[in-house]
């Protein structure tokens, strides 16, 4: 049995069995007895606490604990008797008898003998007698029931002298009692009575029996045994025997029996209600105003678990039932109502974000559609490149014709300094009136003005030729030819024109100038006329096309 576990009886038991006690505190002992029946585990906890003090190393504490144990057995009824007749208590008794103080062991054995006599009619409480029989077989001696040794062990003082100078031994007390008795005899012989501070020996050694003494019951008492007396609070009891400090023998209209001495009082005028009120009272003031303190509201936040729990409770509730709603349901409903504004704000935020994402989605789809459309259309830069090449060709031709150089007299070729990047040769046919001036060493002003700019010679056709001389193309425009007579006369009158130095250098440039404009006058192209020259007829304009 674990004796060192904390239980509610430890504090009271330690106070009732304190080393500093000079006498038993019967008021506290009876309070402990009353407390035993207030709980289901009260008897077991009380017995554990008492046996813990019985095993104390101080015999003074152990003797007080045995006195408390005897009082509990006498006052607490069968619920405590069953705990005393348990295996755990039997093992504790064996431990005390083997290791305890001799005085403690004698008193414990005397109590066990007394309990055996009390429990002999109840088969549930037969363990005490069996335990005594077992211990006797082991060599432990027990006093006989009602013997003088048992009475002396029970009546042995629980308090052991702590200070030899203040408390006399038992022998000294006996001597003192004898001296007092002798002095009393001498005083009776004298006429004048002499008062003394010490009680008479008869009061100490004889039983105190007061015939006709009456007491009033303070508490109700229900008899647990056949030899006990049942009474109610306020009844008058006639005391027949008060030799035992704990149990008195009394008589009422119900009969004669034993009753606890602490349940009665000698003051016949005392009211039981007043006594109870003084000891244990609970009063309430009617003027007190009861205020309900509401807890502070918790900060609201969206809790999906609570909403699900509320929905589940609402679905499981029967609306046709007349029973009131559960407090938990009302509490959850109030909390969900507090979440309403937060849920509205959350929905507005989600709607705003959804609108923004929808707008972004529309813009992305428009951009992708435009990209797909542009990828599927034909490129626009091809025609623009053709226009740029034609403009570049016209500008290059205008720059290349800035100078005119006479070629050999036989071919009438004129070289014009131009760019090395030119890939086209321009052939010009001169009219007869200009050939005569060329044979005389002079170039007509009209030719000099026409060659550099090429703006007034729009009638001269341009032919697309390759870098190899002699190739012709079917797309070449027709060249204006003067009459044969005029051409022969012009050929006879041709005079070699001196070639300037820069033209010679230009002709000797070699492969760096792969293609140059060639202005050639051939005899076959001259008109064959007699003496008159016909004015040149206008030529058809030739549309220039770039060879890509």
From Swiss-Prot:
Residues 171-190 form the UIM domain. One of its GO terms (molecular function) is ubiquitin-like protein ligase binding. One of its GO terms (cellular component) is early endosome membrane. CDD domains: GAT_STAM1, SH3_STAM1, VHS_STAM1. The keyword Membrane applies. The modification Phosphoserine is found at residue 156. Residues 16-143 form the VHS domain. Component of the ESCRT-0 complex composed of STAM or STAM2 and HGS. Probably part of a complex at least composed of HSG, STAM and EPS15. Found in a complex with HGS and E3 ligase ITCH and DTX3L. Interacts with E3 ligase DTX3L; the interaction brings together STAM and HSG, promotes their recruitment to early endosomes and decreases STAM and HGS ubiquitination by ITCH. Interacts with STAMBP/AMSH. Interacts with PDGFRB. Interacts with LITAF; the interaction is direct. Identified in a complex with HGS and LITAF. Interacts with HAVCR1. This is Signal transducing adapter molecule 1. The gene is Stam.
């Amino acid at each position: 049995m674990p004796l060192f576990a904390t239980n509610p009886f430890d504090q009271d038991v330690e106070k009732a069995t304190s080393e500093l006690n000079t006498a038993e505190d019967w008021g506290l002992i009876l309070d402990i007895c009353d407390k035993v029946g207030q709980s289901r585990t009260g008897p077991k906890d009380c017995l554990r606490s008492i046996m813990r003090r019985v095993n104390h190393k101080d015999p003074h504490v152990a003797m007080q604990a045995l006195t408390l144990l005897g009082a509990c057995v006498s006052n607490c009824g069968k619920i405590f008797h069953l705990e005393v007749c348990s295996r755990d208590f039997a093992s504790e008794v064996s431990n005390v008898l083997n290791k305890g103080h001799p005085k403690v062991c004698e008193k414990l054995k005397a109590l066990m003998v007394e309990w055996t006599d009390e429990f002999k009619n109840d088969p549930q409480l037969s363990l005490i007698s069996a335990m005594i029989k077992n211990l006797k077989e082991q060599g432990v001696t027990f006093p006989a029931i009602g013997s003088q040794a048992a009475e002396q062990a029970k009546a042995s003082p629980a308090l052991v002298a702590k200070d030899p100078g203040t408390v006399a031994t038992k022998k000294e007390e006996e001597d003192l009692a004898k001296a007092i008795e002798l002095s009393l005899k001498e005083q009776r012989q004298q006429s004048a009575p002499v008062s003394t501070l010490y009680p008479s020996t008869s009061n100490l050694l004889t039983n105190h029996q007061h015939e006709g003494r009456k007491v009033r019951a303070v508490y109700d008492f229900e008899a647990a045994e056949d030899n006990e007396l049942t009474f109610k609070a306020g009844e008058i009891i006639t005391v027949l025997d008060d030799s035992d400090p704990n149990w008195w023998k009394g008589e009422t209209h119900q009969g004669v029996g034993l009753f606890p001495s602490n349940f009665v009082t000698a003051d016949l005028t005392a009211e039981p209600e007043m006594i109870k009120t003084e000891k244990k009272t609970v009063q309430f003031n009617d003027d007190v105003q009861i205020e309900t303190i509401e807890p502070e509201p918790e900060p609201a936040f969206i809790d999906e678990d609570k909403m699900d729990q509320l929905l589940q409770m609402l679905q499981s509730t029967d609306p046709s039932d007349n029973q009131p709603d559960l407090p938990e349901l009302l509490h959850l409903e109030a909390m969900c109502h507090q979440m309403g504004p937060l849920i509205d704000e959350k929905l507005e935020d989600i709607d705003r974000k959804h609108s923004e994402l929808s707008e972004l989605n529309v813009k992305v789809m428009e951009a992708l559609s435009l990209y797909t459309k542009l990828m599927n259309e034909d490129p626009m830069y091809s025609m623009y490149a053709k226009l740029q090449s034609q403009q570049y060709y016209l500008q290059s031709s205008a720059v290349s014709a800035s100078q005119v150089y006479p070629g050999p007299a036989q071919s009438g070729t004129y070289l014009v300094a131009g760019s090395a990047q030119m890939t086209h040769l321009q052939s010009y046919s001169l009219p007869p009136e200009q050939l005569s001036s060329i044979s005389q060493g002079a170039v007509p002003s009209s030719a000099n003005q026409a060659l550099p700019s090429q703006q007034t010679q729009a009638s001269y056709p341009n032919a697309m030729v390759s870098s190899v001389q002699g190739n012709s193309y079917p797309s070449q425009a027709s060249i204006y030819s003067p009459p044969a007579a005029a051409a022969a006369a012009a050929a006879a009158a041709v005079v070699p024109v001196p070639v300037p130095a820069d033209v010679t250098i230009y002709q000797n440039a070699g492969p760096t100038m792969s293609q140059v404009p060639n202005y050639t006058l051939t005899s076959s192209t001259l008109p064959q006329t007699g003496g008159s020259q016909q004015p040149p007829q206008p030529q058809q304009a030739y549309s220039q096309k770039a060879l890509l």
